[in-house]
Amino acid sequence: MNLVPTVIEQSSRGERAYDIYSRLLKDRIIMLSGPIEDEMANSIVAQLLFLDAQDSTKDIYLYINSPGGVVTSGMAIYDTMNFIKADVQTIVIGMAASMASVLVSSGAKGKRFGLPHSQVLIHQPSGGAQGQQTEIEIAATEILKTRKMLNGILAKNSGQPIEKIQADTERDHYLTAQEAVDYGLLDGVMENNSKLK
């Protein structure tokens, strides 16, 4: 059961009811929560493009609580974050795992935050293949290319050497918010929203 709260606002013209996500969008807040897949990515991309077109001089706030998901869907969000002019502030609430860790680390420099009890998980991409031997080889080659690409992004975003990223993503590597700051994936731990600019 998916319940989306409704917010009622008063104006001189009467009352207006919004779903909570539409109301947050008015304040340039986008919620990325749950597994990253095509439908969610399309919604996030559309919101980023809309807010950038509305005013590219104002920051966009992307709150992330996600176990990760489909790499190509995540890369659509990543590319859009870099494509638009507006700075995207990223804030981890809960968990930013796998592809979500790439996204949270890709926020505007100096504007990547985590709440005190949030976590970041980095690891290598996973996938599966079946079929003929040549199809399995093609899939294996592709996942190695994907891993190299994601490790490169994490290295660029964190300032860590690629060799450290490769070693740390060999297995699940959990980081508290403060550890993610020390690692270079985040810029600060937020106790309250006073750090948001």
From Swiss-Prot:
Gene Ontology molecular function: ATP-dependent peptidase activity; ATPase binding; serine-type endopeptidase activity
InterPro entries: ClpP (IPR001907), ClpP/crotonase-like_dom_sf (IPR029045), ClpP/TepA (IPR023562), ClpP_His_AS (IPR033135), ClpP_Ser_AS (IPR018215)
UniProt-listed Enzyme Commission number(s): 3.4.21.92
Tree of life domain: Bacteria
GO biological process: protein quality control for misfolded or incompletely synthesized proteins
Main location: cytoplasm
Keyword Glycoprotein in record: no
Active site per UniProt: S98 (nucleophile), H123
Subcellular compartments: Cytoplasm
GO CC annotations, alphabetized: cytoplasm; endopeptidase Clp complex
SUPFAM superfamilies: ClpP/crotonase
Alphabetical UniProt keywords: Cytoplasm, Hydrolase, Protease, Serine protease
Catalysed reaction equations from the record: Hydrolysis of proteins to small peptides in the presence of ATP and magnesium. alpha-casein is the usual test substrate. In the absence of ATP, only oligopeptides shorter than five residues are hydrolyzed (such as succinyl-Leu-Tyr-|-NHMec, and Leu-Tyr-Leu-|-Tyr-Trp, in which cleavage of the -Tyr-|-Leu- and -Tyr-|-Trp bonds also occurs)
Assembly information from the UniProt record: Fourteen ClpP subunits assemble into 2 heptameric rings which stack back to back to give a disk-like structure with a central cavity, resembling the structure of eukaryotic proteasomes.
Function field: Cleaves peptides in various proteins in a process that requires ATP hydrolysis. Has a chymotrypsin-like activity. Plays a major role in the degradation of misfolded proteins.
Family, per entry: Belongs to the peptidase S14 family.
Protein name: ATP-dependent Clp protease proteolytic subunit
